[in-house]
Amino acid sequence: MKTGPFLTKPGAKSIGLRLAWAAAAVMALSVGVAEAGQSMVASEIEKSFRGVTLDGIYNDGTFFSETYFDDGSIRYHDAAGADSGDWSVRENLFCTFYEGQQGACFFVEREGANCFIFFEPVRAADGRIVPREIWTSRGWNRKAAATCSKPPEAVI
């Protein structure tokens, strides 16, 4: 007589219970991953950006590239030049501060597997800090195809 974790009674096969276990496993693996329109949490931000180079575009159409090194340093490039600084995650906000230009902290939302949308924090009427409605920039890990819903465009 066979028994096991997926059998409801000795010798019986239970598809329903197997499906329940499979669904539970999938849900456990997806815990902590922001869905579209939801801000990412600190651990997800750090895991997504540490040691990665993002290529991206600001909402004004300017392209940039930024490398987030494991030691917390950052290297930034755009059409106007390059800069260095530091990156960190503070209270679920992604922060970048530079030697030669102003830095800031941002809410980050994920769009698909490889598109990160950055929003400036603003104070809501009730006093909470929330993402601004209009995105500041979008970026993607250059090692994979971007999954942003509208592909970036260059203005020529």
What spans do the regions from the language model cover?
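Lipid interaction determinants
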Residues: G32-S84, T96-I156
